[in-house]
């Protein structure tokens, strides 16, 4: 006998969901930087219940164990964004401890011991082992000199802690890579005002008997070519990724010449916001296992070094990062619409895929999960923009008759970054309550080639905003969402998109800004070295900067705001300081517009603590429900919304 079930007609936004803010916070276990070590595999795993501490895990034949117990926090602060915070080789791990920036060494189940001296003002990242000389080679960032900005170098760190500068003179360095025979060192460097996805240089030097780097020569790159991930093949041939063709493709350097290895309208690289990323690895001298992105979706494949042919490999993933290999075993981080990011091992010899770690150990029932639809739509000036659209999904509820759902448009951070289709409980939190979501890959996003990425050059606050506005209008026009209940949210650079959309366009009814940029001039004044000239690329060259800053900074156009807003700000944020949010809050207060402001102590750029995730999500939901006059659940904590009628 079949029992008929029916959904309860309930206003969108008022649906009850098992995906609570606490579930989102508990499920958000960051996984990063897998690293094979023979038959073992290491990776970093976040502890939201411990203030966001990152710990080093190792899995081998004896099981899984933690190498860096509390209070150790395996994070680098080089460039502020870090990455490349540890190295695992031969059962020994070297790592950067966030609290003091010193390098530590730990072996098996022993206690970590400090390698470098205390209180030097030095930070380290992106290590490579130079075993023959009893040292590591790393990127060092020196904050001890009292200058406006730190000094970046390539540095040798002896096993005894002694530090020796190997390469200096450029503003930034990354990816030191030692050849298999230990005789050559490749590295990347770049200069202000460039970011590493604008222009980098690949250098090669010989390692002298005393360990110094000599006979240095420029291999490829410059101001108009972005190179990333230099790697040596097992036979000692240098490979790298370059966007000289308009796409981040694979190249190799042999016989004093650079050759394209696999030319394709696809991205084999990603922006170097963090150290230590890996989109390809060598299975052998003849085969490269790689992740590549086409139209914002990742794939796994094998490139032949003989003819450059690409053979796709079937995986369940649409977002693939940090590809590593040991023998036939590929290790990667993968995600998909119904798969949260997970650490997986794939045996190229044919054994079943094995998942070593889940970012969300316990997933909600799939009936509560909205599966995104990749869409493209027309935007301003004849452009085509791209996004992932999520319709509301909940097996227990349906909209009221003739009701269309409210829409939340998300502008990703960066802004040189991208939205993916990977399962994010923070998105499902909204869709399972009756909100539709549009996650926009606006012009300037990665995953669509250099030309699309460069659409944001001198156009930040314009192109990104236009593409978000166009996406909302497109969905309203085709009858997918309620044109009178359009919302926009974003963090960091996406926060500028939110504020600009509300200041310069009359489309969205409310917005949420997470540590968003409101004053471009202030961002310039307060920014750290890595992003100190990023604005020159995003907005205008120095001679026109001040005029453009004033023209595009929402703080100077706050009189145009007509919509309620909620702001979230970490008080320890060094990337986008609290003043950026506070000035906008004061401006809305002065106009008597509805505004809410939540500050979080001990949080920086991005919220790591579970309590912070819960507080902000619940506050944002409460804010939207109050703005739209939807009944507020009794168990949802109230927040103060100034100037909003009861």
Residue spans for each PLM region:
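Conserved beta-propeller blade repeats
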Residues: 26-40, 73-93, 120-136, 170-185, ...
